[in-house]
């Protein structure tokens, strides 16, 4: 999904991975045909930070209407300025209306709701809003260190309580995690597909004292009742076919060089369109420049199999050799 060291090109990578995850979740769980996107579908999640900030943008590229909850308004400001969310509001009513209006028209949108995800889920459930896809990307690897904000606290109150009353903060985190899980189960009963997105949310719920989240009803040795996105979506749809992240960087820092490589990659995939994964990747790289994915150096990520990586590398070498880039 992302990478370390010299392979890391910023959050663009997680946008592509999330785009693929959402599209294929729609196909596997919602019955969407391989040649269609998520138009007319609603995705709800939480988190607009360093990695989680990809969710709204990925949902838009995949064609979905989406609402992403985030308690830190500075994070929302970053994503809004960046163009990775299209709307922002602290009103549950307004956030829901914007998303549902776009969903009804089959148009994509990414609504950043400044508030707690549990408040959002309660509002949607009580107003009988059907959510097609649901996930979570709060920082549940450190829930008691500020990574998960308890319901009823603002972001600023959370920071103050964490400093002055960490034990009390932990109690509120556990209570909110338990209620968060209850709301997910209620949506699941209504047909929502929830998937774990690798942020330790399910483990955090278990650590809060919820044993029913475990497959064996007792402990986490056999895993959890909700699936991981890797085992349930990306594995069978992409990794099992050899598709994975392929990156290149234009060290000239010239956006025109990146544009030319995008065009070359799109032309190659279009000419060698073997399966629906290729079409998805074609759409991704065709629209990559328009979607303003670059952060920093002029780099691109594109899921490819071994054949695609090799042939694109040879094509780029040829372009350098001929002075095209």
Identify the residue ranges that each predicted region occupies.
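Patatin-like phospholipase A catalytic core
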Residues: 1, 95, 139-142, 146, ...
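Catalytic or ion-translocation cores adjacent to nucleophile or general acid/base/metal-coordination motifs
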Residues: 3-6, 10-20, 39-42, 48-104, ...
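A short, basic/flexible loop-to-alpha-helix module at the beginning of a structural domain
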Residues: 18-40
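Solvent-exposed alpha-helices and their adjacent loops that cap or buttress functional pockets
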Residues: 32-38, 60, 77-78, 101-106, ...
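General beta-strand structural signal in soluble alpha/beta enzymes
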Residues: 45, 68-69, 111-113, 133-136, ...
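A short acidic, amphipathic alpha-helical/loop segment
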Residues: 55-58, 122-124, 183, 315
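Short, well-ordered coil/turn segments that N-cap beta-strands
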Residues: 64, 107-109, 192
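Active-site/ligand-binding-proximal alpha/beta "capping" segment
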Residues: 110-138, 145
